[in-house]
């Protein structure tokens, strides 16, 4: 659990980078053998790419580092429960373990809305550990959206 807290802290640092860019503050870290091999934060608005989620970018970077699309032996740390797209990418990249901070009751596909990561009819499943630094991860998101709503009201 100590390593999980450390790596989630790094994911939170990535999420803060996203917030500074006006992106939804979500950050991701991928480790292998307790070493960080990839890090990323949301860039969807910056790149105007619907797939530029933190998890998706981190997975692409990790695959490049390892020279393989199979990310066996890796752990993905992400500040928000993965969405359907990211959960699919996790399954397809064979990541065996996912650790996330905040639940996403409206779009989470790692147990909240549905659980694609442990779907028995897929040929790969991931262990999911949730709630690591949940409060810090949740606060980043709620603060971001509160400020976004306040800014929209002040411009109207």
Curated annotation (Swiss-Prot):
One biological process term in Gene Ontology: tRNA wobble adenosine to inosine editing
This protein's record includes keyword Hydrolase: yes
Binding site for Zn(2+): 53, 83, 86
Gene3D superfamilies in UniProt: Cytidine Deaminase, domain 2
InterPro entries reported in the protein's UniProt record: APOBEC/CMP_deaminase_Zn-bd, CMP_dCMP_dom, Cytidine_deaminase-like, tRNA_aden_deaminase
Catalysed reactions, semicolon-separated: adenosine(34) in tRNA + H2O + H(+) = inosine(34) in tRNA + NH4(+)
Molecular function (Gene Ontology), one example: tRNA-specific adenosine-34 deaminase activity
Cofactor(s), by name: Zn(2+)
A Pfam family recorded for this sequence: MafB19-deam
Keywords from the UniProt entry: Hydrolase, Metal-binding, tRNA processing, Zinc
PROSITE patterns: CYT_DCMP_DEAMINASES_1, CYT_DCMP_DEAMINASES_2
EC number from the UniProt entry: 3.5.4.33
Active site: 55
CDD domains: nucleoside_deaminase
Top-tier EC class: hydrolase
Boundaries of every CMP/dCMP-type deaminase domain copy: 2-120
Cofactor note as given: Binds 1 zinc ion per subunit.
Subunit structure: Homodimer.
Physiological role: Catalyzes the deamination of adenosine to inosine at the wobble position 34 of tRNA(Arg2).
Stated family: Belongs to the cytidine and deoxycytidylate deaminase family.
Name the record gives this protein: tRNA-specific adenosine deaminase
Lineage: Bacteria, Bacillati, Bacillota, Bacilli, Bacillales
């Amino acid at each position: 659990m100590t390593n999980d807290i450390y790596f989630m802290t790094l994911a939170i640092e990535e999420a803060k980078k996203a917030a500074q860019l006006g992106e939804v503050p979500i950050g991701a870290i991928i480790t292998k053998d307790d070493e960080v091999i990839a890090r990323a934060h949301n860039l969807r608005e910056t790149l105007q790419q619907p797939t530029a989620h933190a998890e998706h970018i981190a997975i692409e970077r990790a695959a490049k580092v390892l020279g393989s699309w199979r990310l066996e032996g890796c752990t993905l740390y992400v500040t928000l429960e993965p969405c359907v797209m990211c959960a699919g990418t996790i399954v397809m990249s064979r990541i065996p373990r996912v650790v996330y901070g905040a639940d996403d009751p409206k779009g989470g596909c790692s147990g909240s809305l549905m659980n694609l990561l442990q779907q028995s009819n897929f040929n790969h499943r991931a262990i999911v550990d949730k709630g690591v630094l949940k409060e810090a991860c949740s606060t980043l998101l709620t603060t971001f959206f509160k400020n976004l709503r306040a800014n929209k009201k002040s411009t109207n």
